[in-house]
Amino acid sequence: MSTFRYKCKQLDQEIQWWFSGTGNRAFWKFEKKLAELHEWYWSLALDPFPYSGFFYKCFYELFQLWVKLGLIVQVSYLILLLDFFVYTIPKKMASQIETTVEKVKQSGIPADILRKRAVDYWKKNNSHNSQMQDVLPNVDEIYEGMRANIAKYLGRSSTVTSIAKLGKCKVYRKKNIPLANLPSLQTSCVPITLTEESVGNSDYTTEETNSEVKSLHVGAIEIVMNSFASSDCNILGGFLLIDTCHTDINNAIRSIFVAPMRGGRPIRMISFPDTLVQIEPNMNKRFQLLCTTSNGDFMQGRDLAMMHVNVLAHAVTHTSTYTPTPYYEKILSREKGFIVEYLNRMTYAVHNQNHPTEKDLLESDFQFDFEGQPVLKRISSTKAIFSKGSSFRYMISGKKEHKIDKPRLEEDGSKSYIDGLQDTFDTTHATLQSGADLFKRNLDDVSTISDTMLGAMIGQTKVVIPKTLVAGTVLKSGPLSDVMQQGSFRSTIALQRTHIITGKIHVVAMLETAVNTGLGLAICFNSGIRGKASADIYATCSQDAMIWNPSCTKVMQYAFNPNPCSDGWSLAFLERTGYHCVVTCVTGWTGTPLQDTFMTINWHISREACVPKIYTIFDPEPDMMLNRWMGRAIFPQQSTQVVRRMPLSIGGGAGAKNSILMNLPNAILSMWRYFKADLEFELIKMSSPYINATIAFFVAFGDLSDDTVNFEAFPHKLIVFSDKQDRTTISFSKDEFLMAWSTQVRPDTKLSEDGCPYLYAITHNGVSSSVEGDFILGIKMVGLKAVENIGVNPGIIGSRLLGAVAQSGQTQQVWNKIWRIGTPPQATDGLFSFSIDLLGVELVTDGQEGAVSVLSSSPVANLLRTAAWKCGTLHVKVVMTGRVTTTRANWASHTQMSLVNSDNAQHYEAQKWSVSTPHAWEKEFSIDICGPNRGFEMWRSSWSNQTTWILEFTVAGASQSAIFEIFYRLDNSWKSAGNVLMPPLLVGNPRLDIKGRAAAAA
């Protein structure tokens, strides 16, 4: 106050002179001085007031009088004011309220008071649905401050409508700024004009402009659109509000609006950008509206709508900023915007929330790279050059991988997911308009099932676990569709009536076991099953499987895609394709429990999107999922070292003598002669948690004896298994191998002549525990990376229990033998007929005695039988060899071949050949295998009425045509997906001589 009094006295003499006659000549100086005093005084706490010379003199005299009254009078006056506002007024108000309450008690509530309040409430909340007024928020709804409140009290507004008049702590509010008309194009762009004035450096030369204001905080934008289309049209408009200062689409898209483009009433889109915009010539290009329509029936070249915009913003300087209201900060900024709904129109709005996460921080690199200006350096008196200036480099980097393995039974149900927007938008605060006609509430809604784990639950299975359980026991086996036919869960009906489900099937298995025992269980999923298929873990786990030890992991979760060819599935798809589920025991109880128990399996529809898993044979993927069960490594509790070895030539099947087990990944890998790759293994502990061990893993040749003393001289990986550790993974780079190795090895090959690498597992120290039992590890080869394949493999009879991998496409001309059929020497009427299912690898004859057939378990034959879905070109070659005892002059044999796509007589022939060449001939043709599941076809499936290809033979003079051999070759475009559980395949391949007699295999 003393500072103010001093300045007033300082200016008093000048003011007295200005009011004199001579002061009229300097009236403009008076106004300027008064403005300085006004700005200085109100900058203390108040907002500017309307001033003039007379107003100032009166104010000054009153102020001087107040000062002269003295401190005692001032305090007395303030006490009187305090008594009036604190005591007198509340007492009178309480008296009036008490009188009103007494009247209500005596007379009751007036009859029309509730009706009036209801009418007022309806008008307040529904007026925007019936009136075409602007809905841009008021200034006090967005910004607050003492300066604005005092200005409002004094009758002066702190709001301006021109950028040129914008000053510190001012609010810019401009309505009806015209925009360019919206053209009728497939996609159009309309800049959002924030000011009608041209903003540039020249604007700041005027006296009215406040040069301190450099930016605007854009609080609200209302886009008003009047459509020229018919009021009864069905055109839907989609609008994207874009911030052009961002190049990343996740940051650029601020809001999405969808609304009908019918004429009549305007479309009003409100957005709250909450963004600081620099005042510069291109500020009107900062925000742009991208528009498109659902159909293009409006005439091209014509304008579809006229548009204008209303803007509310606040000036921001280096010394002052805005203060948002709690309503704006907690409600409007969170909702981001909305569409005004007129006459129950269907409207929809969603807004981007692209906030950084912990993962973004950990995976970001902040690199500082500063190069100084070149420096002129003198070399000599006649020469100088520019040399490089000083430089500065520094980088801040987080971890490249940040993975948290945390079991979770309940998914986060707080987010709302909108189809088509999951990848870009966090729709936690998406706003659906109120009313009966919501954007997504249609009777023809075909969207997928998306809910919480409880809401998306489709089934529950109880599996009895007996107390006497050994490895290989099948606990449950059957179609997966049977599990999902239970009608007592929330999403069961939705599952039965939804055409396309894009989420994976989420499985949660729970089993309580004692900690002093161990158990290995597996739940396996395969695309099909044929005949008396084997349920061995080698065959069942190759497609999708969860293998775990319940003693270490009480709750096991797994998600899989039942349609490996596509990103969607349905219940009818599971039923008609025969998708199969097997629950099997991998390792029995290591300690016998007292009673039987049971396991509970819950089935849910996951929010995780389905991803296809397709194997490309001759142009394979960089990362190949294998799921090849290598076997169990058992380490007993003893004082001596135990050695376990597993071959890495993984192209053959698994099984006993004269029969093998085969699955799709191994059949694919066996197509190559040699291979080399990075190997990744998963180690699963299957014994009691109290039995621990330290195991060393390394790769070496298989002929190392068990008593080798320097095993750990090889480069090895030392794994320490703790009490509760269930599993871990190890990997070996292909750089550790000198060269590639064979995918298949003959079963009679000695280890010293093998020449292929083996995976070794040896005990680093002894296994000991107070609990009885062995330390058991289940080993699975998860996948291969950066695979190199060399050559094509024709196959080996009964190749050793090994496996193979493939990569890098090649043109191959190597044929695989499939069938060898010998005709009967004494055919009835000289005729013999048979048919071959080319895709199912099956043979049907007319049943005559003397006919002999042999099926070769070659790589292509195994691939066709184990692959559920096939796509590509199959090349077939038929070779006939006649009996040499028949002379050329006496040759009278004739063969007729017909190619049909079904064994039903109602199907027409696709191709037909007649061959009568004596003694020997061959015929080659190709078939394009294509189907309804994104080009993939399933053999003999009732789903989409899928069939097969049949090659029918009718041989006249069968005694002369002794042997028919069928060979296959796959085209470079061949693809396969999904595994079929098969019975054990015979590997015996006796040869026939040209007289039809069986010969010993060489």
From Swiss-Prot:
Report a single Gene Ontology molecular function: structural molecule activity
Q: Where is this site: Cleavage?
A: 433-434, 806-807, 985-986
Q: Known Gene3D superfamilies for this protein?
A: 2.60.120.20
Q: Which domain of life is it from?
A: Viruses
Q: Per the record, a Pfam family?
A: Como_LCP
Question: Which keywords annotate this record?
Answer: Capsid protein, DNA-binding, GTP-binding, Host cell junction, Host-virus interaction, Inhibition of host innate immune response by virus, Nucleotide-binding, RNA-binding, Suppressor of RNA silencing, T=3 icosahedral capsid protein, Transport, Viral immunoevasion, Viral movement protein, Virion
Q: Where is this region: Hydrophobic?
A: 46-68
> Which SUPFAM superfamilies does this one have?
Positive stranded ssRNA viruses
- Which GO terms of the cellular component aspect does the record hold? host cell plasmodesma; T=3 icosahedral viral capsid
Annotated region described as Involved in tubule formation by the movement protein, given as residue ranges? 392-398
Gene Ontology BP terms? symbiont-mediated suppression of host innate immune response; transport of virus in host, cell to cell
Q: What is the protein's name according to its record?
A: RNA2 polyprotein
**Species of provenance:** Cowpea severe mosaic virus (strain DG) (CPSMV)
